[in-house]
């Protein structure tokens, strides 16, 4: 080891480490706010025939379902298929919303490596 070089963990690296910890705290605080926001969302998913709408939170928790009475006169397989289709659409929309919100939260972190 050359004289005066120490372990390579000088003041510059300490400052980077402090910045990284500060950013991590900001993300943690933002994550708490985001969690509440996702819990309070109501994201719809509609079947292709438009007769069923399912609502999920941003955390994919079921919130409600609306079924057009006209669907109930259909064959059971059509009813079940419409419900499943609406659930899948709502789930996809909810997970995409969560992914997008997480990207917003963590964008620009640029945490340095040590």
Curated annotation (Swiss-Prot):
InterPro entries: YbaB-like_sf, YbaB/EbfC. Transmembrane segments: none annotated. Keywords: Cytoplasm, DNA-binding. One of its GO terms (cellular component) is cytosol. The keyword Transmembrane helix does not apply. Coiled coil: none annotated. It is found in: Cytoplasm, Nucleoid. Belongs to the YbaB/EbfC family. Binds to DNA and alters its conformation. May be involved in regulation of gene expression, nucleoid organization and DNA protection. Homodimer. This is Nucleoid-associated protein MAE_23910.
């Amino acid at each position: 080891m050359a004289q005066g070089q120490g372990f390579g963990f000088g003041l510059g690296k300490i400052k980077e480490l402090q910045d990284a910890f500060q950013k991590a705290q900001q993300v943690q605080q933002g994550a708490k706010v985001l969690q509440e926001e996702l819990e309070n969302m109501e994201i719809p998913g509609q079947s292709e025939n438009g007769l069923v709408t399912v609502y999920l939170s941003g955390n994919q928790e079921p919130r409600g379902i609306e079924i057009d009475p006209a669907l109930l006169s259909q064959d059971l397989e059509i009813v079940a298929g419409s419900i499943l289709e609406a659930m899948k659409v709502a789930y996809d929309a909810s997970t995409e919303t969560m992914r997008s919100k997480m990207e917003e939260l963590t964008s620009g972190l640029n945490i340095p490596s040590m």
